[in-house]
Amino acid sequence: MVELFILMMERVGLIILLAFLLVNVPYFKRVLLSREKMSSKVQLILIFGLFAIISNFTGIEIAKNQIVPNNLLTYLSSNASIANTRTLVIGVSGLVGGPIVGSAVGLIAGFHRVIQGGGHSFFYVPASLIVGLIAGFLGSRMAKQTVFPSAGFSAIVGACMEMIQMIFIFFFSGDLSDGATLVRFIALPMILLNSVGTFIFMSILTTTLKQEEQAKAVQTHDVLELAAETLPYFREGLNKNSSKKVAEIIKHYTKVSAISMTNSHQILAHVGAGSDHHIPELEVITELSREVLRTGRMTIAHAKEEVGCSDPNCPLQAAIVIPLFSHQQIVGTLKMYFTDPAQLTHVEEQLAEGLGTIFSSQIELGEAEVQSKLLKEAEIKSLQAQVNPHFFFNAINTISALMRKDSEKARKLLLQLSKYFRGNLQGAVQTTIPVSQELEQVKAYLSLEQARFPNRYQVTFDVEEAVASEKVPPYAIQVLVENTIKHAFGSRKENNQVRVVVKAKQHKLHVDVYDNGQGIPEERRLLLGKTTVTSEKGTGTALENLSRRMANLYGSEGCFLIENLETGGSHVHLEIPMEQEELDARINR
């Protein structure tokens, strides 16, 4: 029995190899993490089925309670049996992939065991199928929660699955006396090692994925902080001063040896190793950078020769060069240099690609703000630009707070924020935008607020379908909704209702925002929208901002009204003249 135990431990190593492949090879990891998809289930069946067959081939032949030396078991005599890790593979496949994967792997392993031969081997098919189904149903409960079973729970399941196998061997291995003899010889090593093997497998799986998730959360948190710090500088445009500050910030947050930034023809900043000859204001000196400027694709150099620096003493041995875009045109590059090529890993590549996307958006935002200052409607543009940073920093704080609690939810909110700012890049150079676009921005804001305060606010929208293309000032509805959320309800944590109504009446677009809050003190209501109002929670600047923009755009034809409701709460009303072409379109509908 001791010899069998030692030999079985060697076979368990095969399962450890499988766990290593699943969490370290990118292809297998993608299949594992998308296991709810049918295509992934098929691939898991093939992977685990292959390892189950290998377990049969590498099993330990036993005849008359004696271990028969053999390297590869392709065929068994009629009086022989096998001690192997087949049940371990089947059980793990069910825990990871669910009942479909578990039962399919069980059938593959069972039929292959029958093909190998040996006395009374047909019972291995139903035994393997039952093991796969039970383990699969136990694992599917966890899959619905997007987590894997714990190692301890899996170890208990593994032991139970092997016990089921022993019961089948006892009753169906010919005479009961033969079955009992075989079970006494193999039961303890196989049950114990099946449990230990399952424990080790799931430990590797859960621990590695958890550590990776934590690392991603920390990295995303750092990237958000980095983006928040670089935003003010990119708003100045891509120039020597802003590039130097941005390069210093990036180097502080990353482990790179040097950071360099260029425009389309010259070096704007270089911080770190190689700064003695990578001098700002010189022309771009590396062939690598020139190639990226030509092609517009991220390029990676893993050797000094690929970097292409003309200085023979340059310490830079590897690099990632990312193109920076503005309005789909290449405006420069961001370069991350390494003095040791081993420092350039897949993590750095993903980080660089993400930073390139963020910085390109920030450059576009900065250019939009610069252009807005040159437009005739300078006052309107400057008022609009005041809203952007305010919302951005609120959103960053919300996502940062979620990062360590629910990184997946934070990722989705970050995508919402990205979509929001992509739309704002258009609104930043326009005096009006479609109602549909404005409502998308409002919903992006609300998704972030609901993340901070789940179920605190109930917001409903009553919007005529025909007004979706009508024009409103950027941020008009968002300012009203945001002001209501922040000030209407005080410390009340439930039954906070907001209703947004957008309809066309008498050649004008009517926007109404109602709430069931505590109302507005009369002396303050008379001042809101006309001047700043000192209070503990704000100054009323946003409403004054909107009122001034309405006046500049529409003059006496526009309307901005704030009132208290007799039933409690408040009501803010906007009237916006509809453009003549929009009126004609409505008449002809």
From Swiss-Prot:
SMART domains: GAF
GO biological process: cell wall organization
Catalytically driven reaction(s): ATP + protein L-histidine = ADP + protein N-phospho-L-histidine
Gene3D superfamilies: 3.30.450.40, Histidine kinase-like ATPase, C-terminal domain (3.30.565.10)
Source species, domain of life: Bacteria
Record bears the keyword Cell membrane: yes
Cell compartments where the protein resides: Cell membrane
Molecular function via GO: ATP binding; phosphorelay sensor kinase activity
Enzyme class: transferase
Chief place where the protein resides: membrane
Transmembrane segments: 4-23, 44-63, 89-111, 118-140, 150-172, 185-207
Entry's EC annotation: 2.7.13.3
Keywords: ATP-binding, Cell membrane, Kinase, Membrane, Nucleotide-binding, Phosphoprotein, Transferase, Transmembrane, Transmembrane helix, Two-component regulatory system
Residues with the Phosphohistidine modification: 390
Gene Ontology CC annotation, any one: plasma membrane
Ranges of residues in domain Histidine kinase: 363-580
Membrane topology type: Multi-pass membrane protein
Every GAF domain range: 238-363
PANTHER family: SENSOR HISTIDINE KINASE YPDA (PTHR34220:SF7)
Physiological role: Member of the two-component regulatory system LytS/LytT that probably regulates genes involved in cell wall metabolism.
Name of the protein: Sensor protein LytS
Organism: Enterococcus faecalis (strain ATCC 700802 / V583)
Top-level taxonomy: Bacteria, Bacillati, Bacillota, Bacilli, Lactobacillales
Gene responsible for this protein: lytS
